[in-house]
């Protein structure tokens, strides 16, 4: 995947360079981006992948911070922390029917990831716009414990990938919009598969204990840019 992203980035940069031929510097739609670091505050919405019981964290408002450092060429190293104000359904698998439903509870979901990000126009903007893509890894964590529900979110490993647009008007500030997908594994506790009530199990027959889910995020951010 990284090789593919790199090839796409090189192709776009080459096309961008060719498109500047025939333009005087002051008339070119391309402008050098002379900053090498950025610190971004962002907010948006997290769309969590659902599960059949609804006990895993749901989507909700999202906010966080991102730091990027120029590595060379079109490449940046990006570190990000995101927080989601989420909620989930809680159940008591030792009870049956309505008595098993503990209601919807507020929970906090946190995402930490480290990415390789590529500016598709290199260290230049096109009409003040810089398209970007990113690919990385991280972990997720959640304060999801609700007694007597045995479900635990844990700290699953996560893949992250996405893209976005930077608006760079000049100076030390920019705006950006980003879409990102977080792919991580969820697991149900063994208690969901025990027929302790004599009326069946909490998890439906044939439901896998562990499964992967894609979780999308759309955010808008404001950045402070730094010179090297």
Predicted regions and their residues:
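Short glycine/proline- and aromatic-enriched beta-strand/turn motifs that initiate or cap beta-hairpins
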Residues: 19-70, 142-144, 218-228
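Predominantly the C-terminal beta-signal and adjacent terminal strand-loop region
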Residues: 170-228
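Solvent-exposed loop segments that connect transmembrane elements
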Residues: 21-23, 31, 90-102, 186-209
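Transmembrane beta-barrel strands of outer-membrane/channel proteins
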Residues: 39-45, 79-83, 133-139, 165, ...
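Outer-membrane beta-barrel proteins
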Residues: 29, 51-55, 67, 100-104, ...
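Gram-negative (and chloroplast) outer-membrane scaffold detector with strong preference
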Residues: 68-149, 154-157, 169, 218-219, ...
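Sec-dependent signal peptide recognition
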Residues: 2-7
